[in-house]
Regions:
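Helix-loop-strand module that forms the ligand-binding subsite of alpha/beta enzymes
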Residues: 4-69
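Glycine-rich phosphate/pyrophosphate-binding loop and the adjoining helix
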Residues: 63-124
Length: 124
């Protein structure tokens, strides 16, 4: 998943609204499919954005594909991100890691046996 803008150190509201609906209504169909979030920011907010987006994957039993660093690239104007050598290297490593996981055959056929979900609250 890739976002264009980070607002106040987080993903924009339109993206969050869309992802809330998709993962609420279809999250069970995404289980065991690998996911990776990428944040593109001018300067700050990438790590908070990255964290928020990864929560959609982790609550849906999706393996999260990682890289050598947090999946972010920095730039404000078109073309500026192309100057972020470290960010671009992080994206290349992420792509290789994703390809390896996909080639390994992650999918419903190889999914672990699911347990019946137990719902508890913080206070019993």
């Amino acid at each position: 998943m890739c976002i264009r803008d980070s607002y106040y150190a987080g993903p924009n509201g339109s993206l969050c609204a869309l992802l809330d609906r998709v993962f609420y209504s279809c999250g069970k169909y995404l289980a065991y499919k690998p996911g990776a979030a990428v944040a593109v920011c001018r300067r700050g907010g990438a790590s908070a954005t990255f964290d928020r987006l990864n929560k959609y994957f982790t609550i849906s039993n999706m393996p999260v594909v990682s890289s050598q660093y947090w999946n972010s690239v920095h730039g404000r104007l078109p073309g500026e991100a192309a100057q972020d050598a470290e960010g671009l290297q992080t994206m290349r490593v992420l792509a290789r890691n994703m390809a390896r996981l996909l080639k390994a055959g992650v999918g419903p056929a190889l999914a672990p046996e699911a347990e019946v979900r137990q719902w508890t609250h913080f206070i019993r």
